[in-house]
Amino acid sequence: LREFFLMVFFPAFLYNGCMDKKKLLLIDGSSVAFRAFFALYQQLDRFKNAAGLHTNAIYGFQLMLSHLLERVEPSHILVAFDAGKTTFRTEMYADYKGGRAKTPDEFREQFPFIRELLDHMGIRHYELAQYEADDIIGTLDKLAEQDGFDITIVSGDKDLIQLTDEHTVVEISKKGVAEFEAFTPDYLMEKMGITPTQFIDLKALMGDKSDNIPGVTKIGEKTGIKLLLEHGSLEGI
């Protein structure tokens, strides 16, 4: 599998033809597009073309992308998308992401044009049935590290913070379309007092309301961190 990705996928991700530094930019397209949509939601009626198509997500996504390309200067880039609601996780747990509000039609109608935008920019995008963008990003991150890349991951999903290490920076989108919080192992330790591995354990203890995953009763972030600092790991607890 590793050789397949290195020979077939990574050459296809080549963005600017510069291989002086092997820098891979991995973008959670579904998450970033959703953030872009809501960043400009208050101006929804302003972002509409002559055909009646809303364009706020398209515009916001392009703006985010332009800022990232200028700042990160990647040699390779891939935008990963979710392939649908049915994944191996829903087969394991039927209520996974249950109870979420319906995706706004104004956002849904723009999605094909975001992919078209990427095509026109010469940026590869990818999705895989039964898997989420997170899974693609996590897999490629580890494979790229083995091949000597430095990686920047961009998402609105904090779950991906677990991937940060000496070669991977995880940037979480914040307000607007150009503000990100960059997580490294040192910054995670400074902000939360835990390691990336402990971050995984913390998520297991807390659960995730946004994904409808229950956690341990009465354990929130503060209590979870306290337990991990006392016992080291989930297994230690």
For the regions a protein language model found, what residue spans apply to each?
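Short hydrophobic targeting helices and cationic amphipathic motifs
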Residues: 1, 5-6, 10-14
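Extended two-metal-dependent nuclease catalytic cores across DNA- and RNA-processing enzymes
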Residues: 15, 21, 45-48, 98-237
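Domain-level signal for Mg2+-assisted phosphodiester chemistry and nucleotide/NA-binding surfaces
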Residues: 19-124, 175
